[in-house]
């Protein structure tokens, strides 16, 4: 299964597997077998239709992005186009196929570099330190990792003092359902679980907020009421219609829940 964390999806934690069983999802293990070509096709459809959504996601962290950026769990590069003006963009993923496609798409950009690396490896911080990275952006990665605490430690170690760690992860555990299982999510987060994740680490959380409250309802409906492992063209178009109003509203009123949580953390 294609995910931002790599080519092969992980299995959810036992307690979340039981939760999924209780809502009687008609999805067998065979139905979630890895199909790279199908995953790429779905991603490209999403990339074409979800441009406004990716832009909205990036706007949540844009003021904090430095000049030398590592995109950890870059996948096929949803955020790459917003970072092409940086001194260096370093795309990092565990999936060789993703990295090859990202390289091909941006082979004329001298500031775009890519590395196949795993955030859980002890050597990971050294890789980023050698590239003088001042900002780490990581969207929709931590939920794919069973040991997300180890990933958090390595991400913090990778940055210099006053460097920024910019994260976006799935939020609102009560909406965990078919889409999460299909995409290999171990969990969804709350503000408190994000604080706990970085407890005792040398970081200051400067901002922590929910993002896309309407999307949480749509995720719940698609994952619980009518389980489906795929986003349709209609789903993307409906979200694009909502973005202009919803983005303005969430700038005025911070939503109490959301599809995602955005975390802005600075190394101290």
Regions found by a protein language model. Name each.
Residues 12, 16-17, 25:
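Cationic, low-complexity basic patches in intrinsically disordered or flexible, solvent-exposed regions
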Residues 23-131, 135-139, 149-152, 232, ...:
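Conserved N-terminal segment of class I S-adenosyl-L-methionine
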Residues 36-37, 41-56, 64, 78, ...:
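S-adenosyl-L-methionine-dependent methyltransferase catalytic module, highlighting the catalytic core
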Residues 140-144:
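A short His-aromatic
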């Amino acid at each position: 299964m294609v995910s931002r964390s790599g080519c092969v999806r992980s299995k959810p934690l036992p307690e979340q597997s039981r939760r999924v069983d209780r809502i009687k999802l008609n999805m067998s293990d065979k139905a979630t077998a890895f199909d790279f070509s199908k995953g790429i096709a779905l991603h490209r459809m999403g990339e074409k239709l979800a441009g406004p959504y990716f832009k909205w996601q990036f706007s949540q962290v844009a003021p904090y992005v430095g000049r030398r950026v590592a995109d950890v769990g870059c996948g096929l590069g949803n955020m790459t186009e917003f970072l092409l003006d940086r001194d260096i963009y370093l795309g990092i993923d565990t999936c060789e196929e993703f990295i090859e496609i990202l390289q091909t798409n941006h082979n004329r950009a001298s500031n775009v570099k890519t590395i196949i690396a795993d955030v859980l490896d002890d050597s990971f911080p050294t890789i980023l330190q050698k590239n003088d990275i001042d900002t780490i952006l990581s969207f929709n990665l931590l939920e794919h990792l069973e040991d997300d605490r180890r990933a958090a430690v390595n991400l913090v170690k990778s940055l210099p003092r006053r460097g920024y760690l910019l994260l976006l992860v799935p939020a609102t555990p009560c909406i965990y359902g078919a889409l999460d299982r299909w995409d290999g999510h171990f969990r969804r987060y709350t503000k408190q679980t994000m604080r706990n994740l970085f407890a005792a680490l040398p970081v200051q959380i400067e901002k922590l907020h929910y993002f896309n409250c309407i999307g949480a309802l749509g995720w719940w409906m698609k994952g619980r009421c009518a389980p489906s492992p795929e986003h349709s063209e209609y789903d993307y178009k409906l979200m694009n219609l909502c973005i202009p109003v919803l983005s303005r509203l969430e700038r005025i009123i911070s939503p109490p829940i959301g599809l995602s949580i955005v975390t802005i953390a600075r190394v101290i």
